[in-house]
Amino acid sequence: MNSDPRLHIIAVTGIVEKNGKYLILKRSEREVAYPGFWTVPGGKLVRHEYENLALTEKTDAWYDIVSRTLEKEIMEEAGLEIEGIRYLTDMVFIRPDNIPALVLSYYCRHKAGNVALGKDMVDYAWIMPEEGKNYQIIPGILDEIIMVDKILKN
C-alpha cells in the first residue's frame, strides 16, 4: 500500500467526437491497469512535463495544465488535434499496484488530423454509443460516451 495517503496519480481523459462517432483506443497488454481493454485517449499529469513551462504572469502557478495535458495526450496517443474541451465528470479508483488514481474526464470535438496510434495503443475505432457493447471497454467509459452523446444531441 502507498505509504503516503495524500499521493494520487492524476489522469485526464478525453472523449473525442467526430460526426456523431466517438474515438476509442485499445490499450497494449503492457499497461498496469486494464491491459488490452478499449479506452478513450488520455494520460497522467507529470510534473516534469509542465514545470519547465512559463509560469502565469505575477503568480507561481501554471494555469490550464489539465486541458494542455489533454491536448498533448490526444496528439501523442491518436495524432489528433481537438477543440471545445468541456468537463464531464471525475472518479477515483485503486490501481492493481495499490496506487489511487484520480481521473478527470472531459469531452471535445475532433479538429484536425487522421488517427495515428502512439506506442501505448494497438488499435482504434470510431463508434456510435450503441456499438460499444461489441468492445471490451474499461468499465464506466461507455457510460461516459453515452453521457456525452446525450449532451451533444441536446
Predicted regions and their residues:
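NUDIX/MutT-family hydrolases
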Residues: 105-107, 116-148
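Active-site-adjacent beta-strand/loop module that shapes the phosphate/pyrophosphate-binding cleft
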Residues: 83, 89-114
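Conserved Nudix-box catalytic region and its N-terminal flanking loop in Nudix hydrolases
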Residues: 21-72
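Acidic, metal-coordinating catalytic segment for phosphate/diphosphate chemistry
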Residues: 1-13, 30
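Residue-level preference for beta-strand/loop junctions
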Residues: 8, 66, 100-102
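Short loop/turn microsegments at loop-to-beta-strand junctions
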Residues: 11-12, 65, 122
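A cytosolic small-molecule/anion-sensing beta-strand core signal
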Residues: 18
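Short secondary-structure junctions
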Residues: 77-84
